[in-house]
Structure formats: C-alpha cells, structure tokens
Amino acid sequence: MTYRIDRFPTSQGLVLNISGRITREDLDILRTALEDGSVVAVELAELELIDRDAMKLLAINEANGIELKHCPPYIREWITRERDSS
C-alpha cells in the first residue's frame, strides 16, 4: 500500500486525509471511502501523486459538493483542464 486514508469527524461531517500515492489499483478503496454520505471534505496536503483515474474520481466528488482542501496546484490544474475539455 502506497497511500493512507485517515478519517476525521468534524461538526460539519467527515474529513478524509489522503497521504501518499493513489493509483488505479487503489480506486475501489478510495471510492468506498468517498461514498460515505457524511464526507464533506478531502484533505490533500500530504498527497504525493495521483494518476488520471484518481484525479477524475476526485473531480467528480468535488463537482458533487465535496471540498478538496489544500489541493496541490498540479492536481487543481489537471481537474480544471479536464472539466474544460468535457
């Protein structure tokens, strides 16, 4: 495993802290964590690397109202480009 997902309850809901590297092989676990109806934000400050599939999953969840906190600039740019091309 090259990543870690920690869950932190807040008064607004659950915040997921993702650290390490997320790849296609990790998507099922990440998707399951994001499907928890109480997730309000994903903390990305410790995220080192993601692939395109993981970026798309984060973009979809952001579009559905989940906040991406401290999103690394390269991921933010990637999400923006992906949305603009759709």
Language-model-detected regions and their locations in the chain:
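Amphipathic alpha-helical interaction surfaces in cytosolic regulatory modules
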Residues: 15-86
